[in-house]
A protein has these predicted regions:
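Glycine-rich anion/phosphate-binding loops
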Residues: 20-25, 83-97, 319-327
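An alpha-helical appendage that flanks or caps ligand/catalytic pockets
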Residues: 5-7, 130-163, 204-339, 374-380
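Glycine-rich, proline-tolerant flexible connector loops at the mouths of alpha/beta enzymes
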Residues: 40-65, 80-82, 114, 118, ...
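Hydrophobic faces of well-ordered beta-strands that scaffold small-molecule active sites
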Residues: 3-7, 41-43, 74-76, 106-110, ...
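Internal, glycine-rich beta/alpha segment that forms the wall or movable "lid"
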Residues: 84-196, 203-231
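N-terminal beta1-alpha1-beta2 module of alpha/beta enzyme domains
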Residues: 1-76, 170-173
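Alpha-helix-loop-beta-strand connector modules within alpha/beta enzyme cores
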Residues: 52-76, 132, 136, 360-376
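Conserved, mostly hydrophobic/aromatic
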Residues: 37, 45, 65, 98, ...
């Protein structure tokens, strides 16, 4: 059972002052997360997606974070692999250097980026990227392991060269793929790497995705393995806000997730710009229910699980917005569905820094110890 946080560097106010404040607040949150027992902080990589994600240089952010921490895992979730965006030689060099400086704390996720806005920034059409991504995905671990690399592929050509340094972890850090659609889960399992399920999947959907991933893993072939370190691992995204005041957590958290979904829809589907209306938790949930279907179906053919009521019954806890007990019940459902790691998403829209800090403290004080004690009992 792993407990982590993933960051987009999302913001409503995109002024220089607020942008700088946002990054420093994220570092403060991540340092607290280490103190409270979280396992890893993951950073996405997106370019030119105003408001939705300003985390465009995760290698710099994660290197800075590594210097501020000693135990916390350092996760790329994920590095975009189009060669003009991130050449495989440079990716291998950066990952290895970060792994050395962090004393072996790196987790390396790979993907392509999800919008034409990003692909077009680097001269690509989104639809042409997958063969390049596949070629780079197989190539990077070889660069990190072999004394010399030479490659003459369809999209990438490298003359024989020694590439340095080599990672701290032997043979290399654990590898993952960004997975929202079923075919990506099948690919991750078949290639013997971890799956980062980055869509807003509820427990039922996580269970079905887990079944797809585990089946592909069980039938994988040695010749399809990416890298030299098989990693069977499924991490599930979990938007959350955990406060002592349940209604406050629901109001702020659901408003944040609504902004997240709307800003995602703006860049992925050309929808309207996101809003930060100050509504009650039930009102936010009702609007989110109306908006979610088209956006999420476009991304991953799934539904966002957002409940409009909390009665305290295990079966009816549909999200992690509420008290520590609410969060425990929902996280238990994700673990029961097959998740190995919870990717908490706190930093959404206008969710204030103070609420995120309280959430990290509450999860570290109540949620993580609950599950760690549970795991210790099961191991006896």
């Amino acid at each position: 059972m792993k407990f982590s946080i993933i960051y987009e560097a999302q913001m409503v106010d995109t002024s220089r002052e607020n942008e700088a404040r946002c990054f420093h607040e994220i570092i403060e949150q991540a340092v607290l997360a280490e103190e409270m027992g979280f396992d890893t902080v993951w950073a996405v990589e997106h370019t030119a997606l105003t408001q939705y994600a300003h985390m465009s240089a995760p290698e710099t952010f994660l290197a800075f974070l590594a210097g501020k921490t000693t135990r916390l895992g350092i996760g790329h979730g994920v590095v975009c692999l189009p060669p003009a965006m991130n050449h495989p030689v440079k990716v291998a060099e950066r990952i290895a250097t970060l792994d050395i400086l962090s004393n072996g704390r790196v987790h390396f996720g790979m993907g392509k980026g999800g919008t034409q806005q990003e692909a077009g920034t680097f001269g690509y059409d989104l639809g042409e990227l997958q063969p390049m991504i596949d070629e780079s995905m197989y190539l990077i671990p070889k660069i990190m392991v072999q004394d010399e690399i030479e490659h003459d592929g369809a999209h990438i050509r490298i003359p024989r060269r020694p590439i340095h340094p080599k990672p701290y972890q032997d043979p290399h850090p654990p590898l993952y793929m960004a997975c929202t659609r079923a075919d990506a889960l099948t690919t991750a399992g078949a290639r013997g790497i971890g799956a980062l399920v980055l869509g807003f999947a509820g427990p039922d959907d996580i269970a079905s995705k887990n079944a797809i991933y585990r089946a592909a893993w069980a039938s994988r072939r040695a010749e399809d393995q990416v890298g030299f370190r098989p990693t069977e691992h499924l991490a599930a995204l979990c938007p959350a806000l955990v406060l002592d005041d349940r209604e406050k957590a629901r109001k702020i958290g659901l408003r944040g997730q609504r902004f997240f979904v709307e800003s995602l829809g703006y860049w992925y589907q050309g929808g309207p710009k996101p809003t930060v209306e100050d509504l009650s938790g039930d009102e936010q949930a009702a609007i989110l229910q109306q908006e979610k279907a088209a956006v999420v179906a476009y991304l991953s053919e799934e539904k966002i699980s957002i409940g409009t009521e909390h009665t305290g019954a295990y079966e009816e806890v549909q999200d992690a917005y509420g008290t520590p007990k609410d969060c425990i019940r929902y996280v238990q459902r994700l673990f029961d569905a097959g998740a190995d790691e919870i990717l908490f998403l706190f930093q959404m829209g206008a969710v204030p820094h103070e609420a995120i800090m309280e959430t990290i403290r509450n999860i570290g004080t109540h949620v993580i110890p609950h599950f760690r004690a549970q795991a210790e009992l099961a191991a006896q």
